[in-house]
């Protein structure tokens, strides 16, 4: 199990009893050796966004291989030259707190006011290790059922698709993925904690999609 939620919400039997996010009994199963937890309780290395920038180096070091998929360019403001690049180009970047999750604290440069950008630069200078920055990616839009002034309407909303790779005896890419949608109009933040949602992802079998009688099947 890859843990992404905070320790306190992981298991209502062991931590916060009011947690609706965790799995009752998970800590007992973990201690008994019946399940493995990546990003184990008490550790937070997988939650640190700065680590992402070193993933290609980790692959080379631990696997002695070259990454097959390139990383999104990630600027670590802990390094003076990268910090200066972020400051000089902040209007074209998205700045993220290194240890926040759920979309909190994110500043999207081309959608922020000058005051917000200046405040972000000041916070970066005060805590260089606490931030990373990446280019702003263009998200696709899909027709989405939304509420407009109390009435249902279909309007475009930004989405991202997250495919997953499962590894057991063999490794494979799942046919489909998690589609997250930014429900506030114009928003690029798809996190549910920021008002985002999810959508079904349908993968059409090419054999059926090209058949003249596909609609009858």
Task: Tell me the role of every PLM-derived stretch.
Residues 2-217:
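Domain-scale recognition of functional cores that engage charged ligands
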């Amino acid at each position: 199990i890859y843990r992404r939620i905070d320790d306190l919400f992981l298991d209502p039997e062991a931590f916060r009893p009011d947690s609706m996010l965790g799995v009752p009994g998970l800590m007992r199963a973990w201690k008994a050796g019946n399940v493995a937890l990546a990003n184990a309780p008490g550790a937070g290395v997988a939650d640190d966004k700065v680590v992402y920038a070193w993933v290609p180096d980790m692959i080379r070091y631990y696997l002695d291989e070259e990454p097959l998929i390139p990383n999104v360019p990630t600027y670590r403001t802990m390094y003076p030259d990268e910090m200066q690049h972020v400051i000089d180009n902040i209007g074209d970047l998205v700045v993220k707190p290194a240890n926040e999750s759920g979309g909190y604290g994110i500043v999207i440069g081309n959608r922020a006011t000058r005051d917000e950008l200046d405040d972000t630069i000041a916070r970066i200078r005060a805590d260089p290790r606490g931030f990373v920055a990446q280019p702003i990616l263009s998200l696709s839009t899909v027709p989405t059922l939304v509420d407009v002034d109390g009435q249902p309407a279909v309007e475009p909303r930004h989405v991202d698709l997250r495919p997953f790779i499962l590894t057991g005896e063999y490794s494979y890419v799942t046919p489909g993925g998690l589609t997250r949608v930014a429900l506030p109009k114009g928003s690029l933040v798809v996190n549910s904690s920021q008002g985002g949602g999810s959508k079904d992802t349908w993968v059409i079998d090419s054999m059926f999609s090209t058949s003249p009688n596909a609609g009858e099947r």
